[in-house]
């Protein structure tokens, strides 16, 4: 029984973000479709070769996506919303981009599909839309073409396919309501057709991803798995693949399925290997997800070996990444600025492939000498002074309940804030960032590279802040922002100014479509050596009589959007960050900033996948926010912002944040999210987003007015704010001006009644 290794997927974007650049060039009309497709082919070939050279036995094919892999699956199944369909029913790459970006075939605006987080990661997918009586057919053969590509290059491949039950689970019904699970029998023939095509190509194993199996699914959904997989059996061997949590609670359902193997995440799940071995059919292959695909830390291979060694030789066994390596940066070797000590603690996607090769070799040979050598830096890290700060640990231990309480309740604070700011009805504001123009990016890059001195850099940033204030005053906005010209990323910027973080040069991971992020890495205890945002907030406020918001990223979001330490709890990291940012709130307030926004877009996405684990997470997540904010005086207005959230199941916790104003993303869901706030009778103020910033479309005054009137039927108008869905960093100035002008006009029309 020779043990093989494999990955569940590999980063798509390229070491230098080649995919992003090719996509954006194509969207801008600066390159042809064939040039775009050629970049995809080159990246796939390179990534397969890199994995093979690193010692991977079975290469994933079908993990590449032009926007996201769920949208790819929608096209595979012929599931294209009517507003994006070509007249002749054909599907091409432009169809895919229209769904993601919001366009009709005519080029006219057409609402993009809703976007949400992929389970509890920082990756996004376009939510499949289902209508009653929907038809499915194989229309997009990208997977088959890529398998042909890989086979032509001589690779041993394992196609990757999102499973039918998870696909339906991830979608939403549009129009007349019905049970989307009833579509299962309609999509299975397409899956059968795809598997038959793969069998024709001589494929032995197909990785069929069913991550929904780690959730606490309703019984009807669990019951759907058996008939679904009965229909799919027989053409190729199926590796039923789960990740992000353990499978033990649903193991009875899983072991009844006619598949030939099971992949389990042994990093994030609590599954016991011996128990799995005992309960799985003896002829099943077990794929052990031992190497963390979601973090950047070097694996303790001695520990991983001990976890799996007792079942070696007792059943067919593969070793694998816990999930797709999509969530990890590509290659540590190109990071030239990390010092040797810190660098020795990390492993990116390619290094994780090396770890899998090393682990496979040791499991096959029984010679464990190489494991101790690989794991040595991990032992050293446990005692490093760069990891432990006694002052931070002491301050954290001294926190009391009083530290998370504002002085007075919202009603008292609201009165003080109304007296201070005297804002009109339907007050208008934006979420924080303004367009990051080429000039701004060049300015920051030149400064970072040392081509620009600090004085000239500061002069340049000040000019862009001044321009943002002038633009907002010209538009007639009521509460202004400084525009965040100095910030490359809402998390990275804070991480750069906090002790306990390090940064990479090329540690990019895909967020959605062409958007990539470069998450900071928490390597040690977190503290704030000096004020971070005060200088620029104070400068912006000096340029106007209108209030300017101080802008902070909240502790839970900084945690969720960073690569966290693995040696302490997430709660500990969040509260350390909260204490650091608490000092920032106090300093902003002392500098005369009266409105401070603490963004927590990641609060909901940080939820554990199993509802039974939610309460503990929400308790410390809310406490971290309150520790951050509670230092503010009554007449300081605390705002928070949240993105793409389903709120109804966490409304108690949203209210418990006790923010004076919450702004939320609602335009893509047509204000549906406000139902949660209405039913809960949310007591504080709300800014429902009135247009989608992820699309270049400019909303009309009438459209915005209609949304606000809809909102006012649910929330009293005196508690409503008017704002876009999210920050405007990724938009251009022309559409930003046009959209905000219409937004302000809509608010003014409503004030006039």
UniProtKB/Swiss-Prot annotation:
<dbReference type="GO" id="GO:0032259">
    <property type="term" value="P:methylation"/>
</dbReference>
<feature type="active site" description="Proton donor">
    <location>
        <position position="694"/>
    </location>
</feature>
<feature type="binding site">
    <location>
        <position position="665"/>
    </location>
    <ligand>
        <name>Zn(2+)</name>
    </ligand>
</feature>
<dbReference type="GO" id="GO:0008270">
    <property type="term" value="F:zinc ion binding"/>
</dbReference>
<feature type="binding site">
    <location>
        <position position="726"/>
    </location>
    <ligand>
        <name>Zn(2+)</name>
    </ligand>
</feature>
<feature type="binding site">
    <location>
        <begin position="17"/>
        <end position="20"/>
    </location>
    <ligand>
        <name>5-methyltetrahydropteroyltri-L-glutamate</name>
    </ligand>
</feature>
<feature type="binding site">
    <location>
        <position position="484"/>
    </location>
    <ligand>
        <name>L-methionine</name>
    </ligand>
</feature>
<keyword id="KW-0479">Metal-binding</keyword>
<feature type="binding site">
    <location>
        <position position="599"/>
    </location>
    <ligand>
        <name>L-homocysteine</name>
    </ligand>
</feature>
<feature type="binding site">
    <location>
        <begin position="515"/>
        <end position="516"/>
    </location>
    <ligand>
        <name>5-methyltetrahydropteroyltri-L-glutamate</name>
    </ligand>
</feature>
<dbReference type="GO" id="GO:0009086">
    <property type="term" value="P:methionine biosynthetic process"/>
</dbReference>
<feature type="binding site">
    <location>
        <position position="117"/>
    </location>
    <ligand>
        <name>5-methyltetrahydropteroyltri-L-glutamate</name>
    </ligand>
</feature>
<feature type="binding site">
    <location>
        <position position="599"/>
    </location>
    <ligand>
        <name>L-methionine</name>
    </ligand>
</feature>
<dbReference type="InterPro" id="IPR038071">
    <property type="entry name" value="UROD/MetE-like_sf"/>
</dbReference>
<dbReference type="GO" id="GO:0003871">
    <property type="term" value="F:5-methyltetrahydropteroyltriglutamate-homocysteine S-methyltransferase activity"/>
</dbReference>
<feature type="binding site">
    <location>
        <position position="561"/>
    </location>
    <ligand>
        <name>5-methyltetrahydropteroyltri-L-glutamate</name>
    </ligand>
</feature>
<keyword id="KW-0486">Methionine biosynthesis</keyword>
<feature type="binding site">
    <location>
        <position position="641"/>
    </location>
    <ligand>
        <name>Zn(2+)</name>
    </ligand>
</feature>
<dbReference type="Pfam" id="PF08267">
    <property type="entry name" value="Meth_synt_1"/>
</dbReference>
<comment type="function">
    <text>Catalyzes the transfer of a methyl group from 5-methyltetrahydrofolate to homocysteine resulting in methionine formation.</text>
</comment>
<dbReference type="InterPro" id="IPR002629">
    <property type="entry name" value="Met_Synth_C/arc"/>
</dbReference>
<feature type="binding site">
    <location>
        <position position="605"/>
    </location>
    <ligand>
        <name>5-methyltetrahydropteroyltri-L-glutamate</name>
    </ligand>
</feature>
<keyword id="KW-0862">Zinc</keyword>
<feature type="binding site">
    <location>
        <position position="643"/>
    </location>
    <ligand>
        <name>Zn(2+)</name>
    </ligand>
</feature>
<dbReference type="InterPro" id="IPR013215">
    <property type="entry name" value="Cbl-indep_Met_Synth_N"/>
</dbReference>
<comment type="similarity">
    <text>Belongs to the vitamin-B12 independent methionine synthase family.</text>
</comment>
<keyword id="KW-0028">Amino-acid biosynthesis</keyword>
<keyword id="KW-0677">Repeat</keyword>
<comment type="pathway">
    <text>Amino-acid biosynthesis; L-methionine biosynthesis via de novo pathway; L-methionine from L-homocysteine (MetE route): step 1/1.</text>
</comment>
<dbReference type="Pfam" id="PF01717">
    <property type="entry name" value="Meth_synt_2"/>
</dbReference>
<feature type="binding site">
    <location>
        <position position="484"/>
    </location>
    <ligand>
        <name>L-homocysteine</name>
    </ligand>
</feature>
<feature type="binding site">
    <location>
        <begin position="431"/>
        <end position="433"/>
    </location>
    <ligand>
        <name>L-homocysteine</name>
    </ligand>
</feature>
<protein>
    <recommendedName>
        <fullName>5-methyltetrahydropteroyltriglutamate--homocysteine methyltransferase</fullName>
        <ecNumber>2.1.1.14</ecNumber>
    </recommendedName>
</protein>
<dbReference type="InterPro" id="IPR006276">
    <property type="entry name" value="Cobalamin-indep_Met_synthase"/>
</dbReference>
<keyword id="KW-0489">Methyltransferase</keyword>
<feature type="binding site">
    <location>
        <begin position="431"/>
        <end position="433"/>
    </location>
    <ligand>
        <name>L-methionine</name>
    </ligand>
</feature>
<keyword id="KW-0808">Transferase</keyword>
